[in-house]
Amino acid sequence: MADTLERVTKIIVDRLGVDEADVKLEASFKEDLGADSLDVVELVMELEDEFDMEISDEDAEKIATVGDAVNYIQNQQ
């Protein structure tokens, strides 16, 4: 899980320009990290590329926090 979290954190920091310390499992992309809808779509696309997977639109809508993203990726691998 640590490797997945590190990779997800790097993508979030690069995409949203937030401090790495703010990227916690419970952090919401929109409320806590300041992402808008387009940012979230782009994050999902980057996660798909990074982890060589496809995330359906239905599943993407359920990914609201950093922890949601990490858990989803872990469960798909």
UniProtKB/Swiss-Prot annotation:
Q: Which residues carry this modification: O-(pantetheine 4'-phosphoryl)serine?
A: 37
PANTHER family listed in its UniProt record: ACYL CARRIER PROTEIN, CARRIER DOMAIN-CONTAINING PROTEIN
* Naturally occurring in which organism (per UniProt): Bacillus subtilis (strain 168)
Protein's name according to its UniProt entry:
Acyl carrier protein
Q: What is its main location?
A: cytoplasm
Q: Which GO terms describe its molecular function?
A: acyl binding; acyl carrier activity
Q: In which pathway does it act?
A: Lipid metabolism; fatty acid biosynthesis
Output the superkingdom of the source species.
Bacteria
Q: Which UniProt keywords apply?
A: Cytoplasm, Fatty acid biosynthesis, Fatty acid metabolism, Lipid biosynthesis, Lipid metabolism, Phosphopantetheine, Phosphoprotein
Family, similarity comment: Belongs to the acyl carrier protein (ACP) family.
What is this protein's function per UniProt?
Answer: Carrier of the growing fatty acid chain in fatty acid biosynthesis.
Q: Which Gene3D superfamilies match?
A: ACP-like (1.10.1200.10)
Q: Which InterPro entries match?
A: ACP (IPR003231), ACP-like_sf (IPR036736), PP-bd_ACP (IPR009081), Ppantetheine_attach_site (IPR006162)
> Carrier domain location, by residue?
2-77
Q: Which gene encodes it?
A: acpA
- Tell me if Cell division is a UniProt keyword of this record: no
Any keyword Endoplasmic reticulum? no
The Gene Ontology biological process terms listed for this entry are: lipid A biosynthetic process
Q: Where does the chain cross the membrane?
A: none
